């Protein structure tokens, strides 16, 4: 064969890698990882896969699958199982994301405490927990706790944080020999550059005024400033804490939570009509039209459903706080839906554990999940543009409580 027909494999590989094809990188990583684990498993068995040898001391017994997150992609890794004993690659454990390492440490803690459920047994097998010693679990937990503590107590120096959202999750934990519910308080905000941040996380016994007050005081002590609007549900303790610690900030009552509150106060047959009227308020093109439509909705409800009209009228100022800001960002600030999506991501991890062994493990796992989300937000696209953020801050100095504006000429109701 002449040289013109020879393939320069080294150059071919270099060319392929230069293309940065995700499929290629994923394939190369999968092949390398499989070969590495196969070699380690063969070493434990004393002979190669299916090799006849007098030195063989163990045999393969199938595989167990788990996801391995890498910068190239998430790879399905087939970990060799052995007939006697177990094999789990230490390097795979060390390379896990913070959130998965936190999950492993929490499950391992439950395992070492003797918690025995079908779900826990499956987790123990999947995560390779049986191979971890008590000292390894302790070291892993200590490292994660230090990282999470540094994250949740860091200075909030990227402000002003013009927009803030707060919510709480109820999680179960074992305390004093029984299972109790505790509240995990979470706050997010938009910094001066338009990126979302996780601002804080705390665990309290109850979602009361004292818990929220301590939470917001901690945020302020760490540097939280420039907050113009806080979006949340209408929990009395939360609203009171906002007023006490952020007196210059307006409060936006989450429209989604309010709709549920209004539905509870509305006769069931009338709810479809009332819901349509409520949605029509938010469908207006500008702040003036929103206020005018609010008046028309109240007029329409007063005669037929006076209690519903009173309920809506009482919530007026808090529901329309968003109108003080540019319309381009109304969807981001008039409800807690972005926060709820974050909560679902946290729930996806915490539901795996179910009942936590202690409060420290809650902070470890939830804190690790939030720290990863924080990094993704900071490294991703801006949540709000700089131009609209500038206009939002400027609007505060030129407009005061537009939701209280009165309309003299009210045309017919629109839906």
UniProtKB/Swiss-Prot annotation:
UniProt keywords, alphabetically: DNA recombination, DNA-binding, Transposable element, Transposition
Family, as annotated: Belongs to the transposase mutator family.
GO-annotated molecular function: DNA binding; transposase activity
Keyword RNA-binding: no
Protein name in the entry: Transposase for insertion sequence element IS1081
Keyword DNA-binding: yes
Phylogenetic placement of the source organism: Bacteria, Bacillati, Actinomycetota, Actinomycetes, Mycobacteriales
Source taxon at top rank: Bacteria
GO biological process, one term: DNA transposition
Organism per entry: Mycobacterium tuberculosis (strain ATCC 25618 / H37Rv)
Its job: Required for the transposition of the insertion element.
């Amino acid at each position: 064969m002449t040289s013109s027909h020879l393939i320069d494999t080294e150059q071919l590989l270099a060319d392929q890698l230069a293309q940065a094809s995700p499929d290629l990188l994923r394939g190369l990583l999968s092949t390398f990882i499989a070969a590495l684990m196969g070699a380690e498993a063969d070493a434990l068995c004393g002979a190669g896969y299916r090799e006849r040898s007098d030195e063989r001391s163990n045999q393969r017994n199938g595989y167990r699958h788990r996801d391995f997150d890498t910068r190239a992609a998430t790879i399905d890794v087939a970990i060799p199982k052995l007939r006697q004993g177990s094999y789990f690659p230490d390097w795979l454990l060390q390379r896990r994301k913070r959130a998965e390492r936190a999950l492993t440490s929490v499950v391992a803690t439950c395992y070492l405490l003797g918690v025995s459920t079908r779900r826990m047994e499956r987790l123990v097998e999947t995560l390779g927990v049986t191979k971890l010693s008590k000292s390894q679990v302790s070291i892993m937990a200590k490292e994660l706790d230090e990282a999470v503590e540094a994250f949740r107590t860091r200075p909030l120096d990227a402000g002003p944080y013009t927009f803030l959202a707060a919510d709480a999750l109820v999680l179960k934990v074992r305390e004093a020999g029984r299972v109790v519910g505790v509240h995990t308080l979470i706050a997010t905000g938009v910094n001066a550059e338009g990126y979302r941040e996780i601002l804080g996380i705390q665990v309290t016994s109850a979602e009361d005024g004292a818990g929220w007050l301590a939470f917001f005081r901690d945020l302020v002590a760490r540097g939280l400033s420039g907050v113009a609007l806080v979006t949340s549900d209408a929990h009395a303790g939360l609203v009171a804490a906002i007023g006490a610690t952020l007196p210059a900030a307006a409060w936006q009552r989450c429209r989604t939570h309010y709709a549920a509150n209004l539905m509870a106060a509305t006769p069931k047959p009338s709810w479809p009509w009332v819901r349509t009227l409520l949605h029509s308020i938010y469908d207006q093109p500008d702040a003036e039209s929103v206020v005018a439509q609010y008046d028309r909705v109240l007029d329409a409800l007063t005669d037929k459903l006076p209690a519903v009209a009173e309920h809506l009228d009482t919530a007026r100022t808090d529901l329309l706080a968003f109108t003080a800001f540019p319309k381009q960002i109304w969807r981001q600030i008039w409800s807690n839906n972005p926060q709820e999506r974050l909560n679902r991501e946290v729930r996806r991890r915490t539901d795996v554990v179910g009942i936590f062994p202690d409060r420290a493990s809650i902070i470890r796992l939830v804190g690790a999940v939030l720290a990863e989300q924080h990094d993704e937000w900071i490294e991703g696209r801006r949540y709000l543009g700089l131009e609209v953020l500038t206009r939002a801050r400027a609007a505060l100095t030129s407009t005061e409580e537009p939701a209280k504006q009165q309309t003299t000429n009210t045309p017919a109701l629109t839906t």
